[in-house]
């Protein structure tokens, strides 16, 4: 009988929830950090056309998968250099609508709609929309984006 009770206790203990970091719910602070990673990366890197900001938002091995193309930090830098050479390029403003933000251990997964407006001299010259997902990971430098997936939504 003692063995049955011991076995029952052991099996019950194995079923208890684990309170490790992996099972911790997303905090309001982490949600704000995740949203700032997305908004800040688009405002400063893509809208601000500043490749120096990549280190503040991306991991070293960051990639974007967009419409069959793989973008890494080096490819983004080349793109930004090209943007600097464009005369009279429009300003880009992005707005996000979040579908979900969930934490898994030391990572945060996000899904959102990304709306961009392109303005030149107070005139709207274009609009784009994407359906995107992103993965942020906790690093020694703080939270950084590790991967994104982007699908263009037809206008």
Residue ranges and their predicted role:
Residues 129-155:
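Short beta-strand edge/turn micro-motifs at domain boundaries
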Residues 102, 116-120:
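Beta-strand elements of well-folded, non-transmembrane domains
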Residues 3-12:
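Sec-dependent N-terminal signal peptides
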Residues 106-116:
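A short hydrophobic beta-strand element
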Residues 93-96, 111-113, 126-132:
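Short, surface-exposed coil-to-beta transition loops
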Residues 14-56:
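Short, low-complexity N-terminal intrinsically disordered segments enriched in polar/charged residues
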Residues 101-108, 136-142:
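A short, structured loop/turn motif at beta-sheet edges
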Residues 51-104, 124:
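A solvent-exposed, acidic/Ser-Thr-rich amphipathic alpha-helical stretch
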């Amino acid at each position: 009988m003692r063995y049955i009770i011991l076995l029952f206790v052991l099996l019950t203990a194995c079923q208890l929830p684990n309170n490790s970091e992996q099972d911790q719910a997303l905090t309001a602070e982490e949600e704000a950090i995740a949203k700032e990673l997305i908004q800040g990366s688009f405002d400063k890197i893509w809208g601000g056309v500043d490749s120096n900001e990549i280190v503040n938002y991306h991991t070293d091995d960051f990639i974007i998968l967009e419409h069959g193309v793989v973008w890494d930090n080096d490819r983004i830098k080349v793109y930004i250099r090209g943007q600097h050479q464009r005369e009279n390029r429009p300003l880009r403003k992005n707005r996000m609508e979040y579908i979900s933000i969930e934490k898994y251990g030391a990572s945060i997964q996000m899904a959102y709609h990304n709306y961009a407006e392109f303005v030149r001299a107070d005139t709207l010259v274009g609009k784009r929309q994407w359906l995107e997902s992103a993965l942020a990971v906790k690093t020694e430098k703080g939270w950084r984006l590790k991967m994104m997936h982007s699908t263009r939504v037809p206008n």
